[in-house]
Amino acid sequence: MTINIKKTFETVDDGIANMIDAANADYENFNVSDEMKARFKEEWVIKNGSKYTKIMTNNGGTAWGFVVNVDDDKKFKKGTLLKCAGWSAPERNGSRGNVLEGGFPINWTGPLYLVGKGSI
């Protein structure tokens, strides 16, 4: 099941917290034990870098997504959600949403479809 992010936020940190809450709510609908649901909620790791905030699950063992945390990115606005290209870098082919503006779908597995130009 997919959760639609609707709220808007002033800070990237608040937007990320809201998105993680939505991913946790989506995981609640997954057919796993209560123990696994509790562990999933506890194992998020957020790492702020100079250009991106990296979001990880499994106590930092799995890269989940990236959020642009600067105002001067040449392609994306601050708060833009990007999927992972790999462990340490985002895929910069298109936005998956914006944690400050809302209006995008998310599920527990990570950022979904492209939003805007080039979207599906």
List PLM regions with ranges.
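Generic marker of "main functional regions" within proteins
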Residues: 26-33, 91-92, 97, 118
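C-terminal partner/receptor-binding element of secreted or periplasmic proteins
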Residues: 102-120
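Amphipathic, interaction-prone secondary-structure segments
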Residues: 35-77, 82
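Hydrophobic transmembrane signal anchors and adjacent membrane-proximal interface regions, especially
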Residues: 3-7, 77, 82, 112
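A short, surface-exposed interaction/processing loop segment used at functional sites
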Residues: 77-107
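Negatively charged, low-complexity tracts enriched in Asp/Glu with abundant Ser/Thr
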Residues: 2-48
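Extended aliphatic helical segments
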Residues: 12, 32, 45, 67-70, ...
